[in-house]
């Protein structure tokens, strides 16, 4: 196994099975963040993740963290909160604000550089990247974004500026996603937060099998149309 240098003249990726074991999942470096290359990466189960000043690094870890949306863990306190939620939740109303919120919400620094923001905004304009927004009146207080692959959603990042805002985004999205035929959410790498929400690890080969099946599936044509998903009770 060796790290592969990508060419700027080809969007081809090596097989994820050739990724390094340490650091887990590192597969390639270089290339660019063009829409064609990003879409090719997601179709192959690969995603970019790198620090400012570093070359673009491409990953496909084994195991892979996923969330079956019907297995989302909702605590009793969250259920009580959501029942009386003051938040309004929308889809694809403010993609730019959401990714900027994710970029600025990391005190320890972030991989969401200006180039990443611009790259995913292009994907959004092309109809591949999507956002969920959580509002308190007219203020954006949380949200999440990711990339659609048929009936699989590749979650990228989320942020929260008020109590339970990002959890509300995920809860409402999961309900909507399941209700329209969505099957699986890719969480990439398991951490304490995603594990507490019900995410689990599966072998990479299993994830790639799911991806190859689900990316050919279809949600309703109007699923990603900008709209309100949840409003607080009067």
UniProtKB/Swiss-Prot annotation:
Pfam families: Leu_Phe_trans (PF03588). Its main location: cytoplasm. It catalyses: N-terminal L-lysyl-[protein] + L-leucyl-tRNA(Leu) = N-terminal L-leucyl-L-lysyl-[protein] + tRNA(Leu) + H(+); N-terminal L-arginyl-[protein] + L-leucyl-tRNA(Leu) = N-terminal L-leucyl-L-arginyl-[protein] + tRNA(Leu) + H(+); L-phenylalanyl-tRNA(Phe) + an N-terminal L-alpha-aminoacyl-[protein] = an N-terminal L-phenylalanyl-L-alpha-aminoacyl-[protein] + tRNA(Phe). SUPFAM superfamilies: Acyl-CoA N-acyltransferases (Nat) (SSF55729). One of its GO terms (molecular function) is leucyl-tRNA--protein transferase activity. Functions in the N-end rule pathway of protein degradation where it conjugates Leu, Phe and, less efficiently, Met from aminoacyl-tRNAs to the N-termini of proteins containing an N-terminal arginine or lysine. This is Leucyl/phenylalanyl-tRNA--protein transferase. The gene is aat.
